[in-house]
Amino acid sequence: MFGGKGGLGNLMKQAQQMQEKMQKMQEEIAQLEVTGESGAGLVKVTINGAHNCRRVEIDPSLLEDDKEMLEDLVAAAFNDAARRIEETQKEKMASVSSGMQLPPGFKMPF
C-alpha cells in the first residue's frame, strides 16, 4: 500500500518536509505585495498576501468625475489584486508539492 519496506516511514518524512516547505511558503506569501488595476490603470490597489490593503492610487483626473464610478473602480482594482494574489498563492503552493510521490487520487488542500 505504501510502496513496500520503509514506505510508511518515507511517506511520513515526505509529509514533514512538505509541511515545513508550506510553512515557509506561507510566510513568503504573507510578505508579497501585488497591485491590481482598473480603469486602464487609473486606479491601483496594492495588497499583501494576507489581503490587507497597503496602498490606493487614484489618478487625479478621476477626482473630477462622479463618486459612484470612482468607488466602482476602487472595488474593481481591489478585486483584481485579490485575484492576482490568489493565483500567486496557488502557483507557489503547487511548487511545494511537486516531486512528491503522493498516493493516486490524493489532492492537496489548495
From Swiss-Prot:
Q: What subcellular locations does the record give? A: Cytoplasm, Nucleoid
Q: Give the matching Pfam families.
A: YbaB_DNA_bd (PF02575)
- Keywords, sorted A to Z: Cytoplasm, DNA-binding
The GO cellular component terms are: bacterial nucleoid; cytosol
- Does this UniProt record's set of keywords contain tRNA-binding? no
Write down the SUPFAM superfamilies for this protein, in alphabetical order: YbaB-like
- Annotated region Disordered: where? 89-110
GO molecular function terms here? DNA binding
| Keyword 4Fe-4S in record | no
Q: What family does the database annotate? A: Belongs to the YbaB/EbfC family.
Quaternary structure per UniProt?
Homodimer.
Main function: Binds to DNA and alters its conformation. May be involved in regulation of gene expression, nucleoid organization and DNA protection.
What's the protein here called?
Nucleoid-associated protein ESA_02800
